[in-house]
Amino acid sequence: MSVHISETRVVRGACPQDCPDTCAFLYHVEDGKLVEVTGDPDHPMTRGGLCVKLKDYAEHHYNPDRLLHAMKRVGPKGSGQFQRITYDEALAEIKKRWTQIIDQYGSQAIMNHCYLGNQGTLNGLTSGDAFFNRLGATIGEKCYCESGSSTAWIMTVGPTGGLDVESLAYSKYIIVWAMNMLSTNLHAWPFILEAKKNGAKIVVIDPIRTRTAKQADWHVQIRPGTDGALALGMMNVIIAEDLVDHDYVDKYTLGYDELKARAEQYPPERVASITGISVEDIRKLAREYATTQPSAIREGVALERSSGGGDAVRLVSSLPALVGAWRHVGGGAVEMPIWEFPFNFDFIQRPDWIKPGTRVVNELDLGAALTGELRLDPPLMSLLIHNSNPVSQQQNANKLIQGLKREDLFTVVSEIFMTDTARYADIILPATLQAEQYDLAVTWGHLYVMLNQPAISPPGECVPNVEMFRRLARTMGFDDDYWKMSDDELLMKMYDWNAPAMQGITLEKLKEVGWMRLNVGAPGQRTPHAEGNFKTPSGKCEFKASAAANGNFIVPVWRNGYNEMQPGDPVDSVPDYIPPVEGSDAVLAKRYPISLISPKPHAFLNSQYANESVQQRRQGEQTVVVHPNDAAARNIKNGDYIRVFNDRGSFEGKAELSTDVYEGLAVANLGYWPGLSRSGSAVNATTSSSHCNLGGAGCQSDNRVEIAIA
């Protein structure tokens, strides 16, 4: 009698999630089945560790609730009633409906809605751009997060990767600003601990005493949306006490006199009244930051999530040049190192296919577009949604749902599970998970090129996004060579493999080793702006932004590579503090006295994994963190179910009384699926569709509510 002994095959991969860490994976396969996913211990950044979100990633692939086949709606929109059809039948229906819409309304009546449910080059943020540009569709501006920060960062220092996260190990003073790193950038923390071991001081600036804040040497608790005022207050002290690196400022910055004049308007006393931080602490923070070199700032995306978020990022990004922090290894700021990668976006997105005068719609305004508020002509008559679950993740979700219910709206959703968004689809196309697809990861938190190789075959009719768009292109009659290229052929054109940063890196080598570091200097030597070399029009750090002359703009990568039809609204060349609209509205505060912020959860990745029972147990049900005094005033006890509401909508959660928030502030994590929640809604039922002052980003943290026992 023979005994079959399974051999484990190990395949190298990369995490696809919307996270700066982009962990190096090892897929363990036995008899064609994925049995385990572990971290690669040899990767210098991620070092073999996986976050709690990925602990059961192998099982995720075999969840019995996965969508495996194309489906067509047979019940009311939102009911989740579908019948199975073949993939070819789905494509035929899409062609029929799109052809009818184009004939009657024109191609701009169709729009793609996509974000970072996957962050690969082939299958991620830009995976549908070329197809929809070729189709002539309305351009959807992808502004869920980072678009405001990108505009602000580029206006100030240009498209630079800035400080290497690994170089934080050499810092002596580290500010983690608006980021709960232990939940959202876990693999950067060991470098901070290494710096701490060598004497560095760790400061966290955050409205909440988060996991990260509790591990810091000093938690500076700030009111939401007032970060720009704090940065100006720090500048005021630095300038008044002559802690400026005048040599660096004279040589490598533009607009110091104007910035100085602006900072003089924000003495610590004024800033204290705005931010809730004491005068003494503002002075202390400024002095320590300026005089303890090398000093570093890790900027979180949450900086942009209020009305003045864009200028807040500009101001925070200006601090390192003011004190000369860029001179040193471990000095400067890191926002999104993606700019170091030599993407060929002209090929990835094919903006040359965009017809002149094509309109744009910010994805955060989709509800207003669908309900007629934007008065679009032609109206939007069809959507294709992929890499996104907007019913959970988009602000002012009730308005979006109202629009998705339109019977005359033809909606196609590519998904892995029957999400709240998929329930409103007319056609569902099943998508692959990472172990089933090939891709070159887009790493936006470190400097490694990482290849993901498929370890198992896709189940059912599931296909990667890149293949879905090939099939759609053939279905719509597109005969361009682009749609005939293999994945490798596409990747060879999607990057400039001859760029200095890619020296020694080849696709064939990546297939052998999985990952390679960009040639941009070793972490212990890297000083990208020690002598200026900023990628701005002046070549300097621009306290006074040259780009402001043309008004507000969204970086083209967030809008299909399109640089026409930009917002263009006026932008102050010197950044200023812009108060939160709702947070500073005294009349609104009487009706809705609680400020609500909705940070990312610890065990979900945005809304991903929120339907997994294991992750639900780890994260727990929806809670609302409330200060004890606010709870007592409303007779709310710890553990009570409470209703959180305003004019836009409401949701329910379990009260968690804590002094981790200050009086007047409540916290409820985003990511929960409305359909799986107690009240059938989630936190984005209460958030507004308003935008921050730059880059079209949202104001999720500028939200006033009231709370009461449910």
Give the role of each language-model region:
Residues 105-109, 244-249, 296, 327-334, ...:
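Flexible, glycine/charged-enriched surface loops at secondary-structure junctions
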Residues 14, 400, 406-410, 414-419, ...:
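Phosphate/diphosphate-binding loops
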Residues 214-222, 432-435, 447-459:
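Short beta-alpha connecting loops at secondary-structure transitions
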Residues 1-243, 265, 270, 278, ...:
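N-terminal export/assembly segments and adjacent metallocofactor-ligating motifs
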Residues 234, 254-367:
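Active-site phosphate/pyrophosphate-binding segments
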